[in-house]
Amino acid sequence: MPNIVDRFGQLVDDAIPKPELARQLLLLGYRAKDVQLLLAPEKELTPARQYAAQIAMDAMIAPLAHPQRAALVNIFMPCELLHAFHLLPMFAEATACYLNGAAAERGFIHYAESAGISPTLCSYHKALLGMGLSGTAGKPLFTACTSIACDANNLTFRRLAQHYGIPHFYLDVPYDHDEYAVAEVSDRLREFAAFLEDATHQKLDEAALQQAVAHSGRTLELLQQAQAAKAGRNLHNDVTSEFYEVFVTHTMLGTPQAEQYARKLLADIEASPMGGGTRLLWAHAVPFYQAPVRERLNFSAENQLITCDMNADTLGCYMDPDKPFESMAARLVNNIFNGSAQHRIQRALELCRMQQIDGVVYFCQWGCKQTMGAAQLFKSCLLYTSPSPRDAHES
């Protein structure tokens, strides 16, 4: 017998031909969950993880409720500029995961495929395309994306911009991690600022941008301390919390909420006891919606999810509020997902040594060609690099 979530998902699917009704149903469900997270948070979660669930839910509701202030972006788009303009980012991975949590993703994926989108496209992007092409997401102000980390970005966001008749901004990031690439991306980010001024009919508040970059700098510094503090500790973690943290480490960078989460997380980790079972690093997105993954990893003393590499992609990045464009550009250029897979492999090895990792799960999510293409290289480097990890598994 279907449970209440499955019934809700079916209601949303049935309402897709009436996109405004589908949007309002999703908002109703998301807001109900938001109230639950505030009044009755999951007791097993630490304070930081409870807070992450709340702010991630708020960040999902806001652009859906106010599409006229929303920007459809990819996960790696620097959003400090959006925060300076008081705009609301919506990104593919979050959209797809929350639809899945509401048991409503199938209808939107089917809608996208019926509109001519390839079945082999990234499932995250198909969900966003389904919401956009059906009209359920509402009409955003514009779309913007980077070339990091996959070729689906240009297709997805350009197609949605054409569908809505709205502007599109594409930020091509050079593969080389050097000062010339940083200078080039800095110039493009200044062009993006001008693009935002045209889209919003407002001038950039440079003080607001500097404040956002300062928030990012403090957030990243706290998160780096938190990653280092994980060594040898029993973290009592769950897979969904790692997904929520993706908001903080990407589209929410530059907000006081992200900084507050990082501060809470560091305190939680430092208060955690030493010891624990098998310590795992997860590479790529965590499929928290799959019951077998939750059963084996959530709050487990035997198998602990220590880190997801998506939440450690910019460790060590210094943000200078007096040089906001250069700082955002350097963070983007030096991201481990930019360029060769060796950058990502080296970060995984750093985390394994830092956090005393026993094994790595490399998740080949359907449609992510970059991740699947690097799987064997990743595995061989991990297996033959001493002293850890001791094991590596593909899924």
Segments (PLM) and residue ranges:
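Conserved small/polar residues in nucleotide/adenosyl-binding loops
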Residues: 384-389
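Acidic/His-rich segments in extracytoplasmic proteins that coordinate ligands and/or metal ions
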Residues: 126-195
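A short, acidic, amphipathic alpha-helical segment used as a generic capping/interface helix at domain edges
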Residues: 131-132, 339-355, 373-377
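Redox- and metal-dependent alpha/beta enzyme cores, enriched for Fe-S-associated oxidoreductases
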Residues: 81-110, 284-348
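A charged, amphipathic alpha-helical module
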Residues: 2-69, 186, 190, 194-318
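An N-terminal, globular interaction/scaffold subdomain
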Residues: 52-53, 57-60, 70-119, 129-133
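Structural motif
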Residues: 73-76, 145-149, 282-287, 364-366
